[in-house]
A protein has these predicted regions:
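A conserved acidic beta->alpha catalytic loop
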Residues: 3-12, 32, 56
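Acidic helix N-cap motif at the loop->helix transition within catalytic regions
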Residues: 8-17, 60, 64
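Conserved donor NDP-sugar-binding/catalytic core segment of glycosyltransferases
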Residues: 64-96
Length: 234
């Protein structure tokens, strides 16, 4: 665990877990808020395992998730990244699910990130070979997309398990909450990826899609989003 310069009692609560389970938790602390990219790298370089798994706060994952991801990496030495499908849930239960591509190629970077970030497991060696997450304010909120692009540009590959082994808390009625500056960041990350991966010239037009999405009225964006992810069980 790493406390990113919190000003409340977060560090005290975290310390209780360390005291109770000293063999399971290590506590790191930033003296001031350094942001997600820096903090992810700090944890990455302190981690001792061969495989690095992520999970966001307030989310849930299947008890089988880690074993299934480990099995993929153990049985496929040419694979560096493994992620899974995700379900979305709120106070009323599960309302949607992603539909990931099982074997993403460079072309899958054209329109969106090819991997869900939160449920991923990655070989530490692959992280280190690309120097982890790029610490750049222009890549805030798109650090994962840029990371995957760096890895693919360096010859690494990944796969997606087509099972919803992870549940992300997300309001089904949420409007388009991404600030416009982060859409500019997304456009910038897409330009970098298109260049790094030597994608066809025509694909540069897709770099502007994050900006176009940001111009869509929130209520329309919300309808599109629900139609994209809503499950038949909802």
């Amino acid at each position: 665990m790493c406390d990113d310069g919190s000003k409340d009692n977060t560090i005290g609560v975290a310390q209780k877990f360390v005291d109770k389970y000293p063999d399971k938790f290590r506590l790191l602390k930033n003296e001031q808020n350094m942001g997600l990219n820096f903090t992810l790298n700090k944890c990455l370089y302190e981690a001792k395992g061969e495989y690095i798994a992520r999970m966001d706060g307030d989310d849930l994952c299947s008890p089988e998730r880690f074993q299934k991801e480990i099995d993929v990496l153990e049985n496929n030495p040419d694979i560096a990244i493994v992620s899974t499908d995700m379900e979305f849930f709120d106070e009323n239960g599960v309302w949607g699910k992603t539909n990931v591509n099982p074997n993403p190629t460079k072309l899958n970077f054209i329109k969106a990130t090819p991997f869900c970030h939160a449920p991923c497991m990655v070989r530490k060696e692959a992280y280190l070979s690309v120097e982890g997450y790029t610490v750049d304010k222009r890549l805030l909120r798109v650090e994962d997309y840029h990371l995957w692009a760096k890895m693919y540009a360096n010859g690494y590959k990944g796969v997606n398990i087509q099972e919803p082994l992870y549940q992300m808390r997300d309001d089904r009625n949420a409007q388009n909450r991404r600030k416009f500056k982060y859409r500019i960041n997304s456009m910038y990350a897409h330009f970098l990826a298109t260049k790094m991966l030597n994608l066809p010239i025509y694909t540069y037009i897709f770099c502007f899609f994050p900006i176009i999405k940001g111009l869509v009225p929130p209520f329309i964006f919300n309808i599109i989003r629900r139609n994209k992810y809503t499950t038949k069980q909802s």
